[in-house]
A protein has these predicted regions:
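Generic recognition of flexible, low-complexity loop/linker segments
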Residues: 13-16, 28-29, 37-38, 96
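Conserved beta-strand segments of alpha/beta enzyme cores
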Residues: 25, 108, 132-134
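Pre-active-site segment of Zn-dependent metallo-hydrolases
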Residues: 32-37, 44-85, 94-107, 111-117, ...
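Acidic Asp/Glu-based divalent-cation binding sites
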Residues: 91
Length: 134
């Protein structure tokens, strides 16, 4: 059985303190059953790994929105210890430039040289210094 974790009634998100040690937890913050917003996290004993930080695409269900981002509660509740980006498609890296306030400077980002170049360009386009994650 997978334990379910929900936010405190006060809206405070502190998921990691509720999780048992020596148990691997994972969650999907998007990309399941639909195209876009690929985001998966793995958490074990205080270490959180994000795999992909993609954006979704606006459609007739989201009028007025330019992009969809991964689940906010997961992003804020589990800041990354490291990030792995599988490839450079927008649905796998597109949310990263919009989440720089959640991703601490110096957080290791592992990816291919080509994907790193794409991400660097997207960060610069938004006025963010990519050297924060070298």
């Amino acid at each position: 059985m997978v334990p379910q974790v929900s936010a405190d009634p006060a809206g405070i998100i502190d998921y990691p303190r509720r999780l048992e040690r020596n148990h691997l937890y994972f969650a999907f913050g998007g990309g399941v059953g639909r195209f876009g917003t690929n985001f998966t996290l793995f958490h074990l004993n205080g270490t959180t790994i994000w795999v992909d930080v993609g954006s979704g695409f606006a459609n007739h269900h989201t009028p007025g929105m330019e992009k969809n981002l991964p689940n906010r509660q997961l992003l804020l509740g589990f800041p990354p210890t490291a990030i792995f980006l599988t490839h450079g498609h927008e649905d796998h890296i597109g949310a990263f430039p919009h989440l720089v306030h959640v991703i601490a400077a110096g957080t290791p980002v592992y990816t291919s040289p080509f994907t790193a170049a794409l991400l660097t360009n997207r960060l610069r386009d938004r006025g963010v210094d990519p050297a924060r994650w070298d």
